[in-house]
């Protein structure tokens, strides 16, 4: 059982018989009332985000989630095909279920696929990925004085803010949790 005092971002709970992930939470103590925990939770099957208030100390079941390592093979229409690294079984996962994780996945990349009751729910790419810059504006002399950033479109379609010295073709390290540029990878 998971208590509201153990809440943290990314924690998965079972609420009303369904799996949810905690996106954000805040402990609130109101005058002359019992404390509550304001929580934003995301339904792992539908992706719908709810805002719920739970009494402090309420307990939740931990959902029975299974994690499998799978290799991304290719996209086929509106779905993506992954291969189980143990059984070599191939599964097709709809685009809606993958969400923004698709921006961090390249061909043949190993990802974690979270299953709930035998059904694939969520794709979790590695914490950091290396992606190549597909296009970005060239740097102009004098741009570096302000230490600003410019947008860069990566090979997967993701757009990130990068320093001015980054050029098209550079390999970048990206944090998949925030979608932010970390550093230029030396090749």
Swiss-Prot record:
GO annotation terms (biological process): peptide biosynthetic process
Gene Ontology molecular functions: translation elongation factor activity
PROSITE patterns in UniProt: EFP (PS01275)
Pathway(s) this gene product operates in, as recorded in its UniProt entry: Protein biosynthesis; polypeptide chain elongation
Subcellular location: Cytoplasm
Top-level taxon in the UniProt lineage: Bacteria
Record flagged with keyword Nuclease: no
SMART domains: EFP, Elong-fact-P_C
Any one cellular-component term (Gene Ontology): cytoplasm
NCBIfam families, alphabetized: efp (TIGR00038), PRK00529.1 (NF001810)
Protein name according to UniProt: Elongation factor P
Organism: Thermodesulfovibrio yellowstonii (strain ATCC 51303 / DSM 11347 / YP87)
């Amino acid at each position: 059982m998971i208590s509201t005092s153990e809440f943290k971002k990314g924690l998965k709970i079972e609420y009303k018989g369904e799996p949810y992930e905690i996106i954000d939470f805040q402990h609130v103590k109101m005058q002359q009332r019992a404390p509550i925990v304001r929580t934003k939770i995301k339904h792992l099957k539908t992706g719908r985000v709810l805002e719920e208030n739970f009494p402090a100390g309420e307990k939740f079941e931990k959902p029975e989630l299974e994690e499998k390592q799978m290799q991304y093979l290719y996209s086929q229409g509106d779905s993506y095909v992954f291969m189980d690294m143990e059984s070599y079984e191939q599964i097709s996962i709809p685009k809606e279920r993958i969400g923004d994780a698709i921006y961090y996945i390249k061909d043949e990349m190993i990802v974690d696929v979270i299953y709930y009751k035998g059904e694939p729910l969520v794709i979790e790419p590695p914490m950091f990925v290396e992606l190549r810059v597909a296009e970005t504006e060239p740097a102009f002399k004098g741009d570096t004085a302000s230490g600003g950033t410019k947008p860069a479109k990566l090979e997967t379609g993701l757009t990130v803010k990068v320093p001015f010295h980054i050029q098209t073709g550079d390999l970048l390290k990206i944090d998949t949790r925030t979608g932010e540029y970390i550093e230029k990878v030396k090749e």
